[in-house]
Swiss-Prot record:
Any one GO BP annotation for this protein: photorespiration
Binding site for Mg(2+): K193, D195, E196
Gene3D superfamilies: Ribulose bisphosphate carboxylase, large subunit, C-terminal domain (3.20.20.110), RuBisCO large subunit, N-terminal domain (3.30.70.150)
Free-text remark on how the cofactor is bound: Binds 1 Mg(2+) ion per subunit.
Cofactor dependency: Mg(2+)
UniProt-listed Enzyme Commission number(s): 4.1.1.39
Comment field (misc): The basic functional RuBisCO is composed of a large chain homodimer in a 'head-to-tail' conformation. In form I RuBisCO this homodimer is arranged in a barrel-like tetramer with the small subunits forming a tetrameric 'cap' on each end of the 'barrel'.
Known catalytic reactions: 2 (2R)-3-phosphoglycerate + 2 H(+) = D-ribulose 1,5-bisphosphate + CO2 + H2O; D-ribulose 1,5-bisphosphate + O2 = 2-phosphoglycolate + (2R)-3-phosphoglycerate + 2 H(+)
Function: RuBisCO catalyzes two reactions: the carboxylation of D-ribulose 1,5-bisphosphate, the primary event in carbon dioxide fixation, as well as the oxidative fragmentation of the pentose substrate in the photorespiration process. Both reactions occur simultaneously and in competition at the same active site.
Protein name, UniProt field: Ribulose bisphosphate carboxylase large chain
Main location: other
Positions of the record's site feature: Transition state stabilizer: K326
Length: 470
C-alpha cells in the first residue's frame, strides 16, 4: 500500500471531471447551477460538487484504496453556459445508483444538497433538476392513491376539484371552525382545508377541531348528496403524535388528511404516505417553507426537484402555485413541474425548465393544487393552465364574499362549471373569459356579487425566478 498511496491534495478535476463519460440508464443524474469563486476554473468547481456530493473529500486518503472509486464516484460529464449569465454555468453530474438507499428521498437529498452547499469554492449553488432512474423509482412507494383512485373515492369527474382554506387560519375555536367548514361545503365546494400552520394550538386543540370538522362534513354530505372532505392537518411535534392524529381521522371516517412535507421532513412524509396507503386514506401535501429553499434563482433547490421528490415520497395532492394569483411562479415553469407530478413520461424541455427526460413508469400521478390569491375572475385561466386533474382552492376568494362563505362557495362552483361547459363546447375560455363569467352571473346572484367585489384585484408582479432561456 505504501508504494501506491500518494498522500497530499490534488485537484478535484483530475478524478471527478470526466467529459467522455456516457451516463448509464441506472445513474441518477443531477443538474446544478454553479457560480464559483473568482479565479477557480469551471471544471474544478463542477468536479468539486461531484466529489463532495459523492465519494470525495479535500485530501487524498489511504482508505480510497479499499474502495472501487471508479464504480462509486460521482462524475461531472458535461458543463454548459447559463444563457444571459456570464458567471454561472450548469454542471451535469452522474451518480451511480448504489450511492443511495433504496426508496429514501432523505438519503438522496442528504448527499446531493448536503455539505457541498457550504463549500468555500462556490459563491452560489442551485440544484436545478434530477433525473431519477427507473431502478430507483421502483423502490419508492409514491402517491398512496393517485389521481384515478382519488376521483373514484370522491366521485368527482370531468372537472377540477374545488376547495378552500378556512379563514382566518388562526384563532377560531373548534366549534366556529367547524361552522365555517360547513358553510363552505354546503355552498358547493368539494373540499375544505386546514391551513399549514394549524396543528394543535391553545385556541384550538387538534382533537376538538377534528370532531367538529367531521360533524360539518357529514352534515354537508347529507344536505347536498355529494361526497365532501376536509384536509385534516396531521403534522405534529413527533411522528408518534402524527400517526395518533391520522388514526383518529380514520376513526371519524374522514377521507383525507394533510401533511406539511418540507417542515415535517421527508422521513415523516414517507412514513405517513405508507400509512395512508395501508389504511385507504388520501394525503394532501402542503409545501410550507419551500420558497426559503427554491425562490433565489442562484442558490438553493428548484421547486421542480422538490415536486419530483414529493411524488416519490408520497402524496396525492401538492400545492404548486397559481401563476395568476399572489404567489411566485411563471406559466411555463409551473407547467413543467405539474407535468412531473401527473404524467407517466416527461421529455426534456428547457422552455419548461426540464433538463432531463423523466420516465415515471406506472407510478400514480399527483393532483396539482392551485391556491393563493385567486378569485372568480381567475377561473378561466386556472382551468386552462391546470386542466381537470387539479384542485382549485379559493380561501379569501370564498370567505371574502359580501354574503358570506356559503355564497362565496356557490359563486366559485357556478364559475367553474360555466368554464368547464364553455371549454367542452369548444370555446377559448381565456380569450372569452369575461363573456363566459358574465353570462353565468345572469343566473347566479352570488357570482354576480363576487365578480363585482373582485374586479379590481390583480397580482401583477414580475417573476423573480425566471427560466434561463434565450
Amino acid at each position: 500500500m505504501a508504494k501506491k498511496y500518494d498522500a497530499g491534495v490534488k485537484e478535484y478535476r483530475d478524478t471527478y471531471f470526466t467529459p467522455d463519460y456516457v451516463p448509464l440508464d441506472t445513474d441518477l443524474l443531477a443538474c446544478f447551477k454553479c457560480t464559483g469563486q473568482e479565479g477557480v476554473p469551471k471544471e474544478e468547481v463542477a468536479a468539486a460538487v461531484a466529489a463532495e456530493s459523492s465519494t470525495g473529500t479535500w485530501s487524498t486518503v489511504w482508505s480510497e484504496l479499499l474502495v472501487d472509486l471508479e464504480f462509486y464516484k460521482g462524475r461531472c460529464y458535461r458543463i454548459e453556459d447559463v444563457p444571459g449569465d456570464k458567471d454561472a454555468f450548469y454542471a451535469f453530474i452522474a451518480y451511480p445508483l448504489d450511492l443511495f438507499e433504496e426508496g429514501s428521498i432523505t438519503n438522496v437529498l442528504t448527499s446531493l444538497v448536503g455539505n457541498v452547499f457550504g463549500f468555500k469554492a462556490l459563491r452560489h449553488l442551485r440544484l436545478e433538476d434530477i433525473r431519477f432512474p427507473m431502478a430507483f423509482i421502483k423502490t419508492c412507494g409514491g402517491p398512496p392513491s393517485g389521481i384515478v383512485v382519488e376521483r373514484d373515492r370522491l366521485n368527482k369527474y370531468g372537472r377540477p376539484l374545488l376547495g378552500c382554506t378556512i379563514k382566518p387560519k388562526l384563532g377560531l375555536s373548534g366549534k366556529n371552525y367547524g361552522r365555517v367548514v360547513y358553510e363552505c361545503l354546503r355552498g358547493g365546494l368539494d373540499l375544505t382545508k386546514d391551513d399549514e400552520n394549524i396543528n394543535s394550538q391553545p385556541f384550538q386543540r387538534w382533537r376538538e377541531r377534528f370532531e367538529f370538522v367531521a360533524e360539518a362534513v357529514k352534515l354537508a354530505q347529507q344536505e347536498t348528496g355529494e361526497v365532501k372532505g376536509h384536509y385534516l392537518n396531521c403534522t405534529a411535534t413527533t411522528p408518534e403524535e402524527m400517526y395518533k392524529r391520522a388514526e383518529f381521522a380514520k376513526e371519524l371516517d374522514m377521507p383525507i388528511i394533510m401533511h406539511d412535507y418540507i417542515t415535517g421532513g421527508f422521513t415523516a412524509n414517507t412514513g405517513l404516505a405508507n400509512w395512508c396507503r395501508e389504511n385507504g386514506m388520501l394525503l394532501h401535501i402542503h409545501r410550507a417553507m419551500h420558497a426559503v429553499i427554491d425562490r433565489h434563482p442562484q442558490h438553493g433547490i428548484h421547486f421542480r426537484v422538490l415536486a419530483k421528490c414529493l411524488r416519490l415520497s408520497g402524496g396525492d395532492q401538492l400545492h404548486t402555485g397559481t401563476v395568476v394569483g399572489k404567489l411566485e411562479g411563471d406559466r411555463q415553469t409551473t407547467l413543467g413541474y405539474i407535468d412531473n407530478l401527473r404524467e407517466s413520461f416527461v421529455p426534456e424541455d428547457r422552455t419548461r425548465g426540464n433538463f432531463f427526460d423523466q420516465d415515471w413508469g406506472s407510478m400514480p400521478g399527483v393532483f396539482a393544487v392551485a391556491s393563493g390569491g385567486i378569485h372568480v375572475w381567475h377561473m378561466p385561466a386556472l382551468l386552462a393552465i391546470f386542466g381537470d386533474d387539479s384542485c382549485l382552492q379559493f380561501g379569501g376568494g370564498t370567505h371574502g364574499h359580501p354574503w358570506g362563505s356559503a355564497a362565496g362557495a356557490a359563486a366559485n362552483r357556478v364559475a367553474l362549471e360555466a368554464c368547464v361547459k364553455a371549454r367542452n363546447a369548444g370555446r377559448e375560455i381565456e380569450k372569452e373569459s369575461r363573456d363566459i363569467l358574465l353570462e353565468a352571473a345572469k343566473h347566479s346572484p352570488e357570482l354576480a356579487i363576487a365578480l363585482e367585489t373582485w374586479k379590481e384585484i390583480k397580482f401583477e408582479f414580475d417573476t423573480v425566478d425566471k427560466l434561463d432561456v434565450q
